């Protein structure tokens, strides 16, 4: 199994359907809402037609290896374009579409904003996230060498193994020979409560234990900034996870955006 195949296998294993349920809005209409922590799903008061709404809007479906591969390669081409003189487009604007819902068998990324509708485009993964995402910010160093600084945003808030949130996945060896991680910024849609830790995991070595890079207690702020000085080589790929599952003051799961600042060299 090649490194790329390992990466794709790991990505596919971490794409799970989120916990969602149905509720009534102020007009007694059925709407899809996140299932709260320790809440038991009860659909006894809903019709079969209304239950179909939940099926059509459940968000996650496991992507095929080919679809994940296309996403990773597209990300790589955006980063590499900064070395060829062509501006890389903001990743999130590429995915943000205003169209019709996807059939269940075609959805591969989360419909995080329920007010936005989606329609598939051939060979393109689709991502919608209500938290604003900045564009990549390439810049050469003082020696004008092939060393650039990037800001990369995640693809949404993923529910990972053991119910933790896998918030970012970075296949470093598919992009540059050496990468230095400078900082991580977590942006929550609602402030979290409780104690948490952010861990970095070696995605290519499953026997290597997760390493704590930051511990914090929930505050009134929506933003957590983590300073790093981590060098990754072609033999490393990492993902970050946050544990335990983050909750806000109402017991709901907030959406999470993760921004990683890094320097890359070829």
From Swiss-Prot:
Domain of life: Viruses
Homology family: Belongs to the ascovirus HvAV ORF59 family.
UniProt protein name: Uncharacterized protein ORF148
Species for this entry: Trichoplusia ni ascovirus 2c
């Amino acid at each position: 199994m090649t490194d790329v195949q390992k990466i794709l296998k790991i990505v596919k294993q971490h794409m799970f359907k989120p916990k969602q349920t149905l509720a009534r809005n102020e007009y007694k209409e059925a709407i899809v809402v996140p299932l709260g922590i320790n809440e038991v799903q009860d659909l006894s008061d809903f019709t079969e037609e209304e239950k179909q709404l939940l099926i059509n809007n459940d968000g996650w479906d496991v992507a095929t290896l080919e679809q994940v591969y296309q996403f990773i390669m597209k990300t790589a081409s955006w980063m590499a374009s900064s070395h060829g003189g062509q501006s890389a487009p903001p990743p999130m604007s590429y995915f943000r579409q205003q169209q019709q819902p996807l059939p269940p068998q075609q959805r591969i990324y989360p419909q995080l904003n329920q007010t936005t509708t989606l329609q598939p485009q051939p060979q393109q993964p689709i991502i919608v996230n209500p938290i604003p995402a900045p564009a990549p910010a390439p810049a050469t160093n003082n020696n004008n060498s092939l060393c650039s600084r990037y800001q990369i945003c995640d693809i949404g808030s993923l529910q990972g193994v053991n119910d933790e949130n896998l918030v970012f996945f970075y296949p470093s060896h598919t992009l540059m020979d050496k990468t230095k991680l400078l900082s991580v910024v977590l942006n929550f849609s609602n402030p979290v409560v409780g104690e948490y830790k952010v861990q970095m995991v070696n995605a290519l070595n499953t026997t290597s234990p997760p390493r704590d890079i930051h511990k914090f207690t929930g505050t009134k702020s929506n933003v957590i900034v983590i300073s790093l000085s981590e060098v990754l080589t072609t033999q490393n790929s990492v993902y970050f996870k946050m544990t335990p599952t983050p909750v806000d003051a109402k017991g709901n799961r907030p959406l999470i955006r993760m921004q990683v600042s890094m320097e890359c060299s070829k």
